[in-house]
Amino acid sequence: MSFIKSLLLAAAAVASVSARRGPEPKYPPAAGTSSYCSYWVDYEGDKSCSRVLEDNVVVLKDFARWNPTVGADCSGIKAGNSYCVEAFGEPEPIEVTTTTRAATTTTQPTATTTTFANGIATPQPTQSGMVTNCNKFHWIAEGVSCSQVISFQKITLADFVKWNPSVKSDCSGMWAGVNVCVGVVGSSTDTAKPTTTAPSNGVVTPQPTQPSMVTNCNKFHWIAKGVTCQQVISYQKISLADFVKWNPSVLSDCSGMWAEVQVCVGVIGSTPTTLATTTTTAGNGVSTPLPTQPGMVTNCAKFHWVAKGVTCNQIYSFQKITLEQFVSYNPTVKSDCSGMQAEVQVCVGLIAGTTPTTTRPPTTTAPGNGVSTPQPTQPGMVTNCAKFHWVAKGVTCNQIYSFQKITLEQFVSFNPTVKSDCTGMQAEVNVCVGLIGGNPTPTQTGNGIATPTPIQPGMVSNCKKFHWIAQGVTCQQVISFQKITLADFVKWNTGVGSDCRTMWAETNVCVGV
């Protein structure tokens, strides 16, 4: 799993869909946590241990191994601690054998022996053109890169390509869903030798590295997919100037930083420049974290970091302020939010609690119903609405009704012009997400099971167990986590296709009938 694991929407955080996740822990890690941990969940006690595992697509065995304070029955998880949910590069505790992929009705056939009587059982399927004297194998899950394989197996790229020629020197030919060779019979070159940054400097440099990295580096940071310069320098408490000096090819705007390489975050004999905070105006007593949104007011007392992909609506909804207040604190954001920059601090509260009044006056949906309706609204919205949601640009139907814990059917019944496929939903309007007197209960299917929506096209009608497909999740992760076969998964969700290439993200799939 990459740093991805994709960042949650701030709006989802408000609803406590799951705890905050990220490449650095917010809370103290539990004692004995794996030193290989590359992704964390900050546990606040609002979910069960099993829900934490499901939300992060982690099995209990791995979770307990990475977090020794967690018991084999998922006991021992405590609020106020950060727990590891990914440990990239950690050696497997049990040697992989050919019995791990038993013969089933899935597309993965029973392991067979290789030819030429070398006596080594070769798990199937394999990378095309793989050598016949292989004695060690690695399963390529979807999304895994050459760099991850050779780093984890401690082999060189040259050996990897030699043993798997069809992979090609640039790794463009590596397949997903196959076994590749990572060791051969009688080979003494199956372990990559670590290199030093410069002769006799005494520092071992992990590979691969960012091109043109300085030779006197003594501290390194692995760049997972999706990680930004700002996250690295903030976590390492170094300045952007030092980071670029030690990694020149990154460039001053960080556009040259590679993913899945080591970068330098400290050098021999150097005390790195630390990132200092400044005050917004001399004498106001408030420290302002940098960098900030251009034109931000000088009397700001509360700040919010704008991660890539975050919208205005997510910020002011999470901070419980209005769009008008947000724009008045950060004028260059503009009323349509087109001017908001990413990876800067924005102001979300003023000194002494000054709060500009909203410029969007409420009106009532109909005379006498007693509910004030914020304007503008989705055309055709029902007149007995009691709860509203502002639709920012780029927000989808699914994000709204999932956040509000209602069904698609309810959402469309409250806002008919949205249409069942959501093509009619307008941006920058208020939609209805709750009625006066409460919402009607969702309609159950004939089997008595309420089916969450939206669903994967082609899902069977007798499904009893469902799994939400977050962005970036693969079929392999789902079937491994749910302990089902690929054949059953495809049978219950015919729309995913036999090779799972048409599985939709942000839908529910069937994992039990």
UniProtKB/Swiss-Prot annotation:
* UniProt cross-references to InterPro entries, sorted A to Z: LysM1-like (IPR052210), LysM_dom (IPR018392), LysM_dom_sf (IPR036779)
Signal peptide annotation: 1-19
The entry summarizes the disruption phenotype as follows: Does not affect virulence on Arabidopsis, N.benthamiana and tomato.
**Keyword terms:** Chitin-binding, Repeat, Signal, Virulence
Q: Does the keyword Signal apply?
A: yes
- Positions with biased composition (Low complexity): 357-367
Query: Where does the LysM domain lie?
Result: 38-85, 136-182, 219-265, 302-348, 387-433, 465-511
Role played = Might have a role in sequestration of chitin oligosaccharides (breakdown products of fungal cell walls that are released during invasion and act as triggers of host immunity) to dampen host defense. Does not play an important role during host colonization.
For domains, the record's comment is:
The LysM (lysin motif) domains are small globular domains involved in binding chitin in eukaryotes. Vd6LysM contains 6 LysM domains.
Question: Gene that codes for this?
Answer: Vd6LysM
Return the Gene3D superfamilies for the record. LysM domain
Region annotation Disordered: where it falls in the sequence: 357-377
From the Swiss-Prot or TrEMBL record, give the protein name: Secreted LysM effector Vd6LysM
Family of the protein in this entry: Belongs to the secreted LysM effector family.
Q: GO molecular-function annotation terms?
A: chitin binding
